[in-house]
């Protein structure tokens, strides 16, 4: 299978710079599998699980939203707010974040930012799922 170059960037800098066979990612346009020589594309990235394959190895991640750009030169740039592999995820911290977000969503306090709480809950659930399943 042909490979393409994947460059993953976070606010902290380069996270990964690898040649991969396929990138599976949830965009604002739906779930996508990006292969080598994919047509040019720019899309938002949802808070969700993401994976890529190198030969027979599959690498899983929790992604906190962002942007993906596929150029015409067989390079994909993924700019994300945050990204964690299962090894990097602190399960206790993710479960605590989930509980806090759920509490804020149940709150009757008019000062609670519900949209922010929903985003925090989605991120926590994604992190927990990636940690528990991979």
What are these model-predicted stretches?
Residues 1-13:
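Extreme N-terminal tail/first-helix region
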Residues 5-7, 37-38, 129:
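Histidine (H) residue identity feature
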Residues 10-96, 100:
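Compact, glycine-rich, soluble single-domain proteins
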Residues 84-134:
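Acidic/glycine-rich phosphate/pyrophosphate-binding loops and surrounding catalytic core
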């Amino acid at each position: 299978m042909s490979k393409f170059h994947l460059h993953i960037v976070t606010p902290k800098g380069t996270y990964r710079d690898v040649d991969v066979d396929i990138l599976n990612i949830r965009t604002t346009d739906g779930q996508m599998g990006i292969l080598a020589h994919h047509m040019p594309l720019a899309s938002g990235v949802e808070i969700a699980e993401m994976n890529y394959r190198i030969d027979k190895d599959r690498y899983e991640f929790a992604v906190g939203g962002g942007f993906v750009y596929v150029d015409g030169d067989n390079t994909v740039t993924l700019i994300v707010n945050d990204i964690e592999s299962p090894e990097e995820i602190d399960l206790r911290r993710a479960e605590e974040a989930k509980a806090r977000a759920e509490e804020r969503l149940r709150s009757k306090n008019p000062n609670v930012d519900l949209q922010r709480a929903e985003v925090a809950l989605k991120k926590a659930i994604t992190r927990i799922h990636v940690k528990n399943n991979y």
